[in-house]
UniProtKB/Swiss-Prot annotation:
This is Aspartate carbamoyltransferase catalytic subunit. It comes from the Bacteria. Heterododecamer (2C3:3R2) of six catalytic PyrB chains organized as two trimers (C3), and six regulatory PyrI chains organized as three dimers (R2). L-aspartate binds at residues 93, 182, 237. Its EC number is 2.1.3.2. Keywords: Pyrimidine biosynthesis, Transferase. The gene is pyrB. PROSITE patterns: CARBAMOYLTRANSFERASE. Carbamoyl phosphate binds at residues 65-66, 115, 149, 152, 278-279.
């Protein structure tokens, strides 16, 4: 089966999901990102790799880190960035998603960065562009529903590689609302592709999706058992905006049962790192002493995210 993200030469055409993305492509993105990290320390934080290219940011859901870092990444590559104000666009007047895409493509767009509440929306856009003879326009998925958040997954892998050097001897725990988390899905696919021998999912039964075991994940409903001797902890927030029904008694009860405290962190290896994709809810999934502690690498994740998104866009642009 053809991978819709790759061209006939196996090169990245779009970035829609980490699922099915070959290990070689992931490593290429991480290695390329390494060459971009130091740009942030320069007096002039720009390289001309996408000069003359137009990048349209289409965020149909709210975002702080992802939208901002994509904009910074585009500008550091010298691209022209257009941020579409969705609430003030014609989509709020009933224009279909694909009609919006056609009109923006007619403005000579080179790349669309898309966040959408509906799973599969970026794939639909990429397929439409191919079907209408516009396959030269690239699509980057910046998060679609519960489905995928590939650049977050990639920046998480970059962060892990930066601090742990190698993937093949790690135990990684993902903790919290995994049911509604596109980040968890992207991280799991990336971790297993890169050869992590043990990936653990920790959370209440109501927030654990079916099929985790089939993905090679060990499931724990007891956080104390799940955190024992892990190398990496990835905390996830409660996605209340995606929940329907009473999946939890309260945020306070969740913290009592699944919040990452200094006492629970001590169950992991002494050099374990703590990650979080944000936004972070202190006192719900993580206590401040851990979030601000020496084992937390949450802010470096954000910094690395710029370089990783630069790498993705640069590769898509043919560099």
């Amino acid at each position: 089966m053809l991978n819709p993200q790759l061209n006939k030469n196996g090169e990245l055409q779009h970035l829609l999901t980490i699922e099915g993305l070959p290990k070689s492509n992931i490593i290429h993105i991480l290695d390329t990102a390494s060459s971009f990290v130091s740009i942030g320390d320069r007096e002039v934080k720009k390289v001309p790799l996408m000069r003359g290219k137009s990048v349209f940011n289409l965020f149909f859901e709210n975002s702080t880190r992802t939208r901002t870092t994509f904009e910074i990444a585009s500008k550091r590559l010298s691209a022209d960035v257009i941020n579409l104000n969705i609430s003030a666009s014609s989509s709020s007047k009933g224009e279909s998603l694909l009609d919006t895409i056609d009109n923006l493509a007619a403005m000579h767009a080179d790349m669309f960065v898309v966040r959408h509440a509906e799973s599969g929306a970026p794939y639909l856009i990429a397929k439409h562009l191919g079907d209408t003879g516009q396959s030269h326009v690239h699509v980057v998925n910046a998060g679609d529903g519960r489905h995928a958040h590939p650049t977050q997954g990639l920046l998480d892998m970059y962060t892990i590689r930066h601090y742990k050097k190698d993937f093949t001897n790690l135990t990684v725990a993902i903790v919290g609302d995994i049911l509604h988390s596109r980040v968890a899905r992207s991280d799991i696919h990336a971790l297993t592709t890169l050869g992590v021998p043990e990936v653990r999912a920790i959370g209440p039964r109501t927030l654990l999706p079916s099929g985790l075991e089939q993905m090679g994940v060990r499931v724990f409903t007891d956080i104390d058992k799940g955190l024992k001797d892990v190398d990496v902890i990835i905390m996830l927030r409660l996605q209340n905006e995606r929940m329907s029904g009473a999946l939890l008694p309260s945020a306070q009860e969740f913290f009592k049962s699944y919040g990452l405290t200094t006492e629970r962190l001590a169950l992991a290896k002494p050099d374990a790192i703590v990650m979080h994709p944000g936004p972070m809810n202190r006192g719900v999934e993580i206590e401040s002493a851990v979030a601000d502690g020496k084992q937390a690498v949450i802010l470096p994740q954000v910094t690395f995210g710029i370089a990783v998104r630069m790498a993705v866009m640069s590769i898509l642009a043919g560099n």
